[in-house]
Amino acid sequence: KWHRPAKFDRNLIVIGGGAAGLVSAYIAAALKAKVTLIENHKMGGDCLNYGCVPSKALIKSAKLAHQIRNGEHYGLNTGAPDFSFRKVLARVHGVIRTVAPHDSVERYTSLGVEVLQGYARITDPWTVEIKLDDGTMQTLTTRSIVIATGARPFVPPLPGLEEVGYVTSDTLWSTFAELDEAPKSLVVLGGGPIGCELAQSFARLG
């Protein structure tokens, strides 16, 4: 049987440093709550590193390439866009670096949030056990817990997929950044927002 602590180390513990976790921690800290944010990977989570930010940067470049090809729609002469795929991806990573300080440990620490790098495990409704990146353990009690751990791409068990090789919406940004040219062909599995954005962007980039 669980026993509610008589007093708490924190008002709020947030597990996950992505968009939802950062907003939760920010609002709580603004209300002068004692907040700890726990993140085991990159601050900013999916949105900054693999989702919203890089995809919108890619979409912008792809849109410009599309408009150059279809200049007559705007009363302009058309032409084939001349670009470097490597430079397009380099710009994407540059945009990530520009936005990253807004989601950084340093910024959230300055806002009054304690940021811990490590893995969290909830042991009861008020207790979180944290294995820090340096190998040490820390246990904190809290009045409330926000679980904002996000999700990962699902790789379907398709025959031959491992042999052919694939990227996910997480890994393509680093893998494609090493290419001088866009892949000659690309199959996108998944018709959700991420799949549609990537399919359109890479089609427009050739």
Where are the predicted features?
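Short glycine/serine/threonine-rich phosphate/pyrophosphate-binding segments
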Residues: 19-27, 46, 194-204
